[in-house]
């Protein structure tokens, strides 16, 4: 694919996003009420626009970034607005990444506040969790610090850790320059490995399930989009691996400092390259799950591009076909949209920010 075709698509996407930026710098959805406050979409759009090299686009990204410190207070707290943060971990993690990319005292101070907010939502001993708990070390969708429920009580399902939120939390720590020996990384590995269809001991691997891929969450079949894969030879119910979560898992492993040549990283990378598809979200999806499979197509593209680039996978295997497919799917005017509605990629701001972010990585990896 000619470079100018990708550049034209990226410029068109940036222009479309800029046309939908509010005067205060934020992006707000016209599709979903949960995205109308600005906190959910703004850090995602800012990170996408920061990949551009156009001065006007970078200026708009800075205006969007200026919206984020307004929620950070000098005492280290976050004031999210009248309705709270819809997606606290994603907002905080993407805010940290954007503010650290911009740098400078103003942005760094706000990034530190957002990072503190993020760390308060990791499941740690301070919140009653211990390494004997399978949830220990992960991040979920809790609106407040996710304290361990008292005996006999049930945890809020939204607070339970998942692989996507955990990957974002870990990458924010890296973006903020936290060293690899920071205990947050070790705690997170405890959770990440539990979502990996992989056995450290080759003798204990079940080839029907231990394929090197990842799943989203522990013990929750409906939220694992590929569903239950079956029962292994030890009698355990196993979840099927699928694309977006395997990309998330690979990002998490690398953020935790595992080497590219390590066994877990290699297994996850091989799963992605062996099953890679630019046209569809790959994985062993069970019957009746085609809508869920399609619902995170643009997130799959975004996470896979980040994961494969970070892992050093050969660009020819994925970057060129992914770029071609994304350019083909772009709508007149510069946006993208997913027909599947289950995870709100039918909101064009969501889909466009994800697609353009993936396309930028493809562009930087290809040699013309």
Positions of PLM-derived features:
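Conserved catalytic core of Hanks-type protein kinase domains
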Residues: 20, 71, 329
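N-terminal capping segment at the start of a domain
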Residues: 19-26
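An alpha-helical repeat/solenoid feature that recognizes helix-turn-helix modules
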Residues: 1-12, 28-61, 74-116, 120-190, ...
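Active-site-surrounding "flap" and adjacent substrate/cofactor-binding loops of secreted or lumenal enzymes
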Residues: 65-71
């Amino acid at each position: 694919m000619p470079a100018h075709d990708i550049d034209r698509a990226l410029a068109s996407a940036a222009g479309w996003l800029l046309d939908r930026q509010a005067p205060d710098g934020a992006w707000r959805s016209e599709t979903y009420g949960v995205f109308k406050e600005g906190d959910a979409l703004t850090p995602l759009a800012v990170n996408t626009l920061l990949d551009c090299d156009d001065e006007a686009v970078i200026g708009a990204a800075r205006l969007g970034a200026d919206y984020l410190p307004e929620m950070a207070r000098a005492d280290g707290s976050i004031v999210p607005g009248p309705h709270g943060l819809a997606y606290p971990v994603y907002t905080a993690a993407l805010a940290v990444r954007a503010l650290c990319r911009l740098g400078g005292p103003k942005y760094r101070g706000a990034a530190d506040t957002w990072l503190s907010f993020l760390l308060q939502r990791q499941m740690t001993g301070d919140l009653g969790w211990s390494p004997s708990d399978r949830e220990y070390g992960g991040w979920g969708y809790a609106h407040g610090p996710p304290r361990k429920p008292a005996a006999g009580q049930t945890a809020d399902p939204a607070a339970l850790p998942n692989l996507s939120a955990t990957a974002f939390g870990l990458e924010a720590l890296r973006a903020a320059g936290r060293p690899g020996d920071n205990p947050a990384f070790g705690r997170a590995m405890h959770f990440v490995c539990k979502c990996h269809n992989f056995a450290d001991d080759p003798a204990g691997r079940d080839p029907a399930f231990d394929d090197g891929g990842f799943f989203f969450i522990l013990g929750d079949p409906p939220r694992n989009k590929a569903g239950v894969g079956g029962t292994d030879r030890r009698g355990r119910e196993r979840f099927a691996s699928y694309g977006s979560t395997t990309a998330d898992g690979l990002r998490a492993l690398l953020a935790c400092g595992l080497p590219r040549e390590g066994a877990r990283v290699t297994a996850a990378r091989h799963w992605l390259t062996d099953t890679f598809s630019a046209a569809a979200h790959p994985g062993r999806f069970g019957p009746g799950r085609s809508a869920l499979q399609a619902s995170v197509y643009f997130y799959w593209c975004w996470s896979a591009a980040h994961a494969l680039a970070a892992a050093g996978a050969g660009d020819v295997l994925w970057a060129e076909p992914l770029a071609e497919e994304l350019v083909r799917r772009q709508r007149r005017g510069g946006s993208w949209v997913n027909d599947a509605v289950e995870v709100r990629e039918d909101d064009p701001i969501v889909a466009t920010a994800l697609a353009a972010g993936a396309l930028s990585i493809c562009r930087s990896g290809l040699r013309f």
